[in-house]
Amino acid sequence: MQRPIVYVGMSADLIHPGHINILSRAAELGDITIGLLTDAAIASYKRLPHMTYEQRKAVVENLKGVASVVPQRTLDYAENLRTVRPDFVVHGDDWQTGVQRHTRERVIEVLSEWGGKLVEIPYTPGISSTRLHSSVKEVGTTPNVRLSRLRRLLDSKDIVRILEVHNGLTGLIIENSKVTVDNQAREFDGMWSSSLTDSLARGKPDTEAVDVSSRLQMVNELFEVTTKPLVFDGDTGGKPEHFGFTVRSLERLGVSAVIVEDKEGLKRNSLFGTDVPQTQSSVEDFSERIRIGKRAQITDDFMVIARIESLILEKGMADAVHRAEAYVDAGADGIMIHSRQSDPAEIFEFCRYFDKLPRRVPLVVVPTSYSSVRESELADAGVNMVIYANHLMRAVYPQVTKVVQSILQHGRAHEAESMLASIKDALSIIPENAG
C-alpha cells in the first residue's frame, strides 16, 4: 500500500532541533517531499541564505525520512502543491502571524482542491533560525564567503541595493539597519567604497589623490566589523599595468567587485560633466584595461564592472550602447551607466537598448542626480544593482556643520544637544562598550 505524501517547505540554511521535530512528525504521516526554497525565493522576503541551493539540497536529501527534494521557486506553495498533490502539508505553527500568514492561507485554499490537510506542529521554544543567523553574523565571515556573495545576490534578487560607506562606523550602520515594508524586512545588500567620500573623509580632492594602498587600509578596517559584500570604486584604474595588481589586492581582501570608469588623465568627478576638462578613453584602450583586470583575478566570483561615461560627457546614446557591447565582449562582468540628468529618461532609454544586446550582463546605476526614481521602476527597466553612492557622507556634513556653528555661536554645547545622539546611544553603537 502506497504511503501518503507529506510536503514540507523549508529554507534549511541552518538545520536545528525545531526542523528535526517537524520532520519526525511528518515522517509519521507518510513519505516526505521537501519543497526546498531557492535562493531567489528566500531573498524575496529575507536575507540571502548562507549556503547555496545545491549545498542546502545536499544536506536535506540526506536527512532521515526525506524521500525526495524539489525546488520551490516562490514563497507561494501553490505551484508545487498542484504538481505534487500531497495528502498533508506539515509546517510549524509560527507562520500563523507575520509575513507568512498569507502564504498559510493560500496553502489551505489550494489543499482544499483535493482534500489535503495542513498539519501544524507547535513551535519549538528556545531556538529559531533567526537567532542562529544572528549568532553566525556575530562570528563574522571569511574573504571567500564575502567575495562570492555579490554574484549570488545578483542571481537571486530583482535588484541589489548598495549604500556608500567611508569608515567602520558607517559600515556598522549599514550592517545593522533594517526596516519592515509591507510585512517584509528590507535592508541594504552591500556597501560601496566611494573614491569621492574616501577622499572627502580625508579632506582631500576627488582626483585620485588618495592612493589605492590607503583606501585598502580603510577596506580592511571596514571588513573587521561587517559581513556584507563590498563594491569598490576603482576610478580610472590608474595605469593599465598597475590595474592587475589592484584587482589582486581587492580580491585577496574579499572585495566582490571593482567598478572602473572609461576615462583617462587627471580624474575629475563625473557629475561636473563637460564643465571641466575630462577625456574619455578609446574603446580599444579601455577594453584592454578590462582584459588586464580579468586576467589578473584568481577566482571566478570577483567582478570587473565597466563604467560608461558617454552620457555624462554628452557623447550620445549610440556611443554608450556601442561601448557597452564592446566592454562586455572584452570580458566585463557588468556595466554601469552614469547620468547627471535630473530625471531617469536617458537611463531608461539606455536600458531598452542594452536589453537588445547579444550578451547580457548585470546593469548598475547610480541615481545621485535622478534621485526621485524608485527602485521598483529601475528593476522593471532591467537594472540589476542600484548604488546610493555618497549619501552617508552628504548626511554627515550639514549636521556636523550645524553643531560646530551652534557651539561657536553660544559658547556652550547645550543648544546643540537636540542635534546629537545621547551618550548612551553613542556608546550602544558598539555593543562591547557595555562591557
Curated annotation (Swiss-Prot):
The keyword Disulfide bond does not apply. It catalyses: 2-hydroxyethylphosphonate + CTP = cytidine 5'-{[hydroxy(2-hydroxyethyl)phosphonoyl]phosphate} + diphosphate; phosphoenolpyruvate + H(+) = 3-phosphonopyruvate. The active site is at D206. Residues 1-139 are annotated as: Cytidylyltransferase. The CyTase reaction requires a divalent metal ion. Highest activity is observed with Co(2+), but it can also use Mg2(+), Ni2(+), Fe2(+) or Mn2(+). Disruption phenotype: Deletion mutant does not produce fosfomycin. Cytidine 5'-{[hydroxy(2-hydroxyethyl)phosphonoyl]phosphate} binds at S11, A12, Y45, K46, Y77, H91, G92, D93, D94, Q100, T124, P125, G126, I127. Its cofactor is a divalent metal cation. Pathway: Antibiotic biosynthesis; fosfomycin biosynthesis. Transmembrane segments: none annotated. GO terms for molecular function: nucleotidyltransferase activity; phosphoenolpyruvate mutase activity. Residues 140-435 are annotated as: Phosphoenolpyruvate phosphomutase. InterPro entries: Archaeal_FAD_synthase, Cyt_trans-like, ICL/PEPM, PEnolPyrv_PMutase_core, Pyrv/PenolPyrv_kinase-like_dom, Pyrv_kinase-like_dom_sf, Rossmann-like_a/b/a_fold. Its EC number is 2.7.7.104, 5.4.2.9. One of its GO terms (biological process) is antibiotic biosynthetic process. Keywords: Antibiotic biosynthesis, Cobalt, Isomerase, Multifunctional enzyme, Nucleotidyltransferase, Pyruvate, Transferase. It comes from the Bacteria. SUPFAM superfamilies: Nucleotidylyl transferase, Phosphoenolpyruvate/pyruvate domain. PANTHER family: FAD SYNTHASE. In the N-terminal section; belongs to the cytidylyltransferase family. Contains an N-terminal cytidylyltransferase (CyTase) domain and a C-terminal phosphoenolpyruvate phosphomutase domain. Bifunctional enzyme that catalyzes two steps during fosfomycin biosynthesis. It catalyzes the conversion of phosphoenolpyruvate (PEP) to phosphonopyruvate (PnPy), the first step of the pathway. It also catalyzes the cytidylylation of the 2-hydroxyethylphosphonate (HEP) intermediate to produce cytidylyl-2-hydroxyethylphosphonate (HEP-CMP), the fourth step of the pathway. This is Fosfomycin biosynthesis bifunctional protein Fom1. The lineage of its organism: Bacteria, Bacillati, Actinomycetota, Actinomycetes, Kitasatosporales.
